Swiss-Prot record:
Name assigned to this protein: Anaerobic dimethyl sulfoxide reductase chain C
Cytoplasmic side: 31-45, 108-118, 172-181, 241-244
Cysteine disulfide links: none
Described purpose of this protein according to its UniProt entry: Terminal reductase during anaerobic growth on various sulfoxide and N-oxide compounds. DmsC anchors the DmsAB dimer to the membrane and stabilizes it.
Family per similarity comment: Belongs to the DmsC family.
Keyword Transmembrane: yes
GO molecular function: dimethyl sulfoxide reductase activity
Single biological process term from Gene Ontology: anaerobic respiration
TM helices/strands, residue ranges: 10-30, 46-66, 87-107, 119-139, 151-171, 182-202, 220-240, 245-265
GO CC annotation, single: dimethyl sulfoxide reductase complex
Cellular compartments annotated: Cell inner membrane
Subunit organization: Heterotrimeric enzyme composed of a catalytic heterodimer (DmsAB) and a membrane anchor protein (DmsC).
Length: 279
């Protein structure tokens, strides 16, 4: 379990980056159909929050690497290393999103160009998420090299992205877009998280090395998972029931904490064939 806590910078990076990409996807769709100029101005202003969270995530990843220069050195292996591909894809996504926001907030972004720019950025974001997931599919780590890792990572994109975008977009008084389906999509996502977590809990006893059982790495798996699901259930209730900005902000925080708990468990399950790290 100690491994999960030691990897807190990666917990922050993965959860925040995934949530930011998920929110960008929602913003991209909303802006494609939003014609009201004042509404679009509002959307572009709150888009900064997405970039800020993404920036915090990248700062956390640099903390994990130790020195910023190591991130640049990692780019030398783009194409041959998934970690290098992850850094490159993330940097491109951040750059495209940042320049789009800057040009749009200055009022210099044509609508047609903006639509294309956001879609291209969204596609790069999806690639970023795919590569981030692939980084952890390591043959020698049986607890990570399975479909549950993909489900876990992509569901964070869904949950974090939906909550963040809903909290940012619903206060817009000039909006012409509708967001009534987002709470339902979030509830479906929570249900899938519960299914994945329960399945993983039962499956842990079947994964072991010569000296370690995977279940022993996360002795608090049950209580942490229950806590995570309770937090996500509270968020689902808030999304369905309230429009208060403060409570919606709390829903974002609770979602990030809940997914952070899930990610701590994920890193705590680091186990290689023949040896273990954690416990």
């Amino acid at each position: 379990m100690n491994t999960g806590l030691y990897e807190l910078p990666l917990v922050f990076f993965t959860v925040l980056a995934q949530s930011a990409v998920g929110a960008w996807l929602v913003f991209t769709f909303v802006l494609l159909n939003e014609k009201n100029t004042k509404s679009r101005t509002y959307i572009h202003k709150v888009m900064f929050v997405i970039l800020a969270l993404l920036g915090i995530g990248f700062i956390a990843s640099i903390m994990h690497l130790g020195l910023p220069i190591r991130a640049f050195n990692s780019l030398n292996r783009v194409g041959s290393s998934m970690m290098s591909n992850e850094i490159a894809a993330g940097a491109i996504f951040f750059t495209l999103a940042g320049f789009y926001w800057l040009i749009a907030i200055l009022g210099k972004m044509p609508v047609s160009l903006g639509n294309v720019w956001r879609i291209v950025t969204a596609l790069i974001g999806i690639l970023f998420m795919y590569v981030m997931n692939q980084v952890y599919h390591i043959t020698s780590i049986p607890t990570w090299n399975n479909a549950l890792t993909s489900w876990s990572f992509y569901l964070t994109v869904v949950l974090g992205g939906l909550t963040l975008s809903y909290a940012l977009l619903i206060p817009n008084k000039q909006r012409e877009y509708q967001l009534q389906h987002l709470p339902s999509l979030f509830a479906i996502g929570v249900s899938l998280v519960a299914i994945v977590a329960i399945y993983q809990g039962f499956n842990l006893h079947n994964i072991h090395s010569a000296i370690q059982n995977a279940a022993d790495l996360v002795p608090n798996y049950a209580i942490m998972t229950v806590t995570r699901l309770c937090l996500l259930s509270i968020v689902a209730f808030l999304l369905f029931r309230v429009k208060n900005i403060g409570l919606l902000g709390i829903s974002v925080l609770l979602t990030l904490v809940a997914e952070g708990i899930g990610r701590v468990l994920f890193y705590g399950l680091h186990m290689t064939y023949g040896m273990t790290i954690g416990g």
